[in-house]
Amino acid sequence: NVARKALPFRGWKSKYPVFNKENPDGRFHSSDVPHEILKCLNYINEKRPEIKTIVIDDYQYTMANEYMRRANETGFKKFTEIAQNAWSVINAVKAMREDLLVVFMMHSEVTFDAHGNKVTKAKTIGKMMDNVVTLEGMFTIVLYTDVTKGENGMEYSFITQNDGANTGKAPKDMFGSVKIPNDLKLVADTIEEYNN
């Protein structure tokens, strides 16, 4: 939990007790420091085979919070280090066990491409993340939340493919539709079924 906030559902504290030295069996960890996140991921990878899914919520705050902690520094070095730290966590996940699904949740932002077209992309800090790394390019699957007003109120979905105005992507036959229910369990189950 990068943003160090309560989870948005009833009973989360009992379902996800805090992971720390006193409780190594915990299932909830809060940190916005990339090397601490890496330590936690490595611990789960090596010592917690019963954990099959990790959700890193509000991942962009690893970048935003480091930027704010270093706001008084001048020059481009801090942006390089922020980008390198974010890149390192994502790259480390690629080397983890195959039965482990790691979900990075991030906010999106609307930018404009060279032709003036609107593009929705993952929110990042600094041009290096956008122009050199291109964060979404590091993932096989990128889903975007879609919110529409329906007959029963607000309806939440995931967009699974690029519609020309976002960087969403997934193997074309994985989800069977461009729009799917906003349900992480459904997503995890579908990915597992597709990969096996």
Predicted regions and their residues:
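Conserved P-loop
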Residues: 1-54, 61
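Charged phosphate-binding loop/patch that engages nucleotide di/tri-phosphates or the phosphate backbone
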Residues: 179-196
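A generic structural signal for alpha->beta connector loops
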Residues: 12-15, 99, 139
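Conserved, well-folded catalytic cores of nucleic-acid-processing
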Residues: 43, 62-65, 96, 138, ...
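Phosphate-binding/switch region of NTP-binding enzymes
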Residues: 102-181
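P-loop NTPase motor core
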Residues: 53-134
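A generic alpha-helix structural signal
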Residues: 41, 90, 188-191
